């Protein structure tokens, strides 16, 4: 783990900030995949539930059949996607939490540039600074986030897939 932390630098911090912008979309895609996998093996839609006898453990027969119809490899894949979704949600939460620890100016610049995807001209106009000042504020924020991200286990242990 010490080796991973030593490798974090300003470029890595910027990659995490840029990556965080697309996390919500990635989560949506993975959720859709999970739903599609579950629907492929869900036979309960074609079954009439009224007056159906109950299965073992007080689970209705259709539910029991649907659970048994999912092959182990698909169940494993669903579990892996679900774990990835949880990791992505946790990462996004941690990145936002750490950004919120910055000073007001730094927080505004980072949020506008990396999360809202605004251009330097727009940020400078909104904050009433020059573009150069905004870039300097961003550089200071990235320096501070470098230390903060290194100390955050969730962020420092997460590997961005390229």
Where would I find each of the regions flagged by the language model?
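Short amphipathic alpha helix immediately N-terminal
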Residues: 101-118
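N-terminal interaction/assembly modules
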Residues: 1-98, 151-162
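Catalytic phosphate/metal-binding cores of nucleic-acid and nucleotide-processing enzymes, i.e., regions
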Residues: 93-97, 118-121, 128-130
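N-terminal positioning helix adjacent to the helix-turn-helix/winged-helix DNA-binding module
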Residues: 91-94, 102-106, 137
């Amino acid at each position: 783990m010490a080796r991973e932390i030593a490798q974090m630098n300003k470029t890595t911090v910027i990659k995490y900030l840029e990556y965080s912008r697309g996390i919500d979309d990635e989560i949506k895609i993975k959720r859709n995949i999970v739903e599609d996998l579950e629907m492929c093996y869900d036979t309960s839609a074609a079954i009439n539930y009224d007056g159906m006898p109950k299965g073992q453990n007080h689970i209705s027969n259709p539910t029991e059949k649907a659970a048994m119809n999912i092959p182990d490899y698909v169940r494993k894949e669903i579990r892996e996607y679900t774990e990835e979704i949880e990791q992505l949600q946790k990462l996004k939460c941690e990145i936002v939490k750490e950004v919120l620890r910055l000073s007001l100016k730094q927080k505004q610049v980072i949020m506008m540039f990396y999360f809202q995807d605004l251009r330097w001209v727009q940020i400078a106009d909104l904050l009433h600074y020059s573009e150069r000042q905004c870039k300097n504020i961003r550089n200071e924020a990235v320096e501070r986030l470098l230390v903060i991200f290194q100390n955050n286990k969730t962020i420092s242990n997460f590997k961005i897939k390229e």
